[in-house]
Amino acid sequence: MEINEKVSKEKLIEFSGEHLYYEIWMLYGVTNSLLKGVEDEYVYNALLESFVIHASIIIDFFYRPQVYSGDARAVHYIPDVASWKEALPSYDRYFKKFHRKRNREVVHLSYKRLDVKPEEKKWNIRKIIKPIRKIVDLFLEKADPKLLHPQMQELRTKR
């Protein structure tokens, strides 16, 4: 069941300036730390888990329908939802493997973890973050600027 909740302009601005900004900012920051390389195994694992959680939250924000009242979704900010959905890259192509790997190796404690070979445990951070950055840029382009907090523009990919 999908809910099409109407959210006030004030709430959207406040939310984007605090929580949405934070999730994307953290994802970008953790990504940069991971790509620089981390010696300490505990720190690496903590950063990787943070990356997976923040990436999941952002991917859900862009792709999942609103299931529960209060779920924040990109479509709340988009005046032309049809054109947004058409422009959004394929979830299956870019994130289906990420979703499966996330479930199997990070967010579910499962005996299936025993089936993961050592060479399969590596995460291709660049392959995951690249389409997310493009989608964030697309969102900033397609969202109604009157519904976004101005600091959201800081998250645009620098070219």
Residues of each region from the PLM?
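Acidic, Ser/Thr/Gly/Pro-rich intrinsically disordered interaction regions
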Residues: 1-49, 67-159
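Juxtamembrane helix-break-helix junctions at the cytosolic face
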Residues: 61-67
